[in-house]
């Protein structure tokens, strides 16, 4: 029997909700803790669903969902959109080399995984080597979990992928698990200013959450005060000037390296 502390790190989206249902139904073992990182940029729909559906369901089986703030637990060097070293934390689009390319993403690790690590260490005295994180990658996302299973933490048993190894599940099957459980359809979790959004998702922020969209515009413009080549939108145009009315596939975008959109 493992002595590791079992931690379900929920992203608040479809795959994470499927794992939640499987835990509640007893098809997955009960974790010791359920946590979710609050980046300060999450779409309001994620918190609305979490508070209305997920949190009460876990409470019924004696589990609390711990919402952990980036502002309180992120490392001082990486709390803002620009790190203290000057590099961007988010995977913005850049025209630095004369054509549109994409920067590396540091936000998921610095604003989610490491934030939860510090909370466990400071609050409970549990170190990274003493816990096993459950992450909600689904079976049809090998680009996201493939590199992870080759890593030291997975090989040391510190990472668990319930929808890959315990109950192999594809995203469309995760949706059915949630529906069969009787929960409403979960939102697609993401930050409202994430460069990985499709135009469909940007348009949703613009129409349904205008205050958040204005915040995204301000951050887009603030980035270029320090880096004139950086843009939030894939067109490498200022966000306020982008036509978001063209049709787009809801699931055409996503992050290949982080723990978002889960």
How does the language model describe each region?
Residues 1-262:
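Nucleotide-activated chemistry modules centered on ATP-dependent adenylation/adenylyltransferase
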């Amino acid at each position: 029997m493992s002595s590791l502390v079992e931690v379900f790190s929920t992203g608040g989206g479809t795959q994470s909700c499927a794992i939640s249902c499987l835990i509640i139904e007893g098809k997955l073992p009960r974790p010791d803790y359920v946590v979710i990182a609050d980046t300060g940029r999450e779409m309001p729909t994620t918190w609305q669903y979490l508070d209305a559906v997920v949190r009460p369901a876990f409470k019924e089986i004696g589990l609390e969902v711990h919402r952990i703030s980036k502002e309180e637990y992120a490392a001082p060097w990486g709390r803002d959109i620009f790190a203290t070293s000057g590099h961007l934390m988010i995977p913005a689009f850049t025209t630095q080399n004369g054509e549109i390319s994409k920067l590396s993403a540091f936000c998921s690790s610095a604003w989610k995984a490491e934030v939860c690590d510090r909370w466990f260490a400071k609050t409970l005295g549990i170190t990274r080597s003493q816990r096993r994180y459950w992450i909600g990658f689904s079976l049809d996302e090998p680009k996201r979990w493939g590199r992870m299973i080759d890593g030291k933490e997975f090989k040391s048993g510190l990472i668990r992928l319930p929808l890959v190894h315990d109950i192999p599940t594809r995203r469309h099957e995760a949706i059915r698990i949630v529906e069969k459980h009787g929960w409403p359809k979960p939102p697609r979790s993401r930050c409202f200013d994430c460069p990985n959004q499709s135009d469909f998702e940007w348009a949703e922020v613009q129409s349904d959450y205008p205050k958040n969209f204005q915040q995204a515009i301000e951050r887009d413009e603030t980035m270029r005060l320090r880096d004139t080549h950086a843009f939030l939108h894939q067109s490498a145009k200022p966000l306020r000037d982008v036509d978001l009315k063209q049709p787009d596939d809801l699931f055409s975008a996503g992050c290949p390296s982080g723990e978002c959109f889960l």
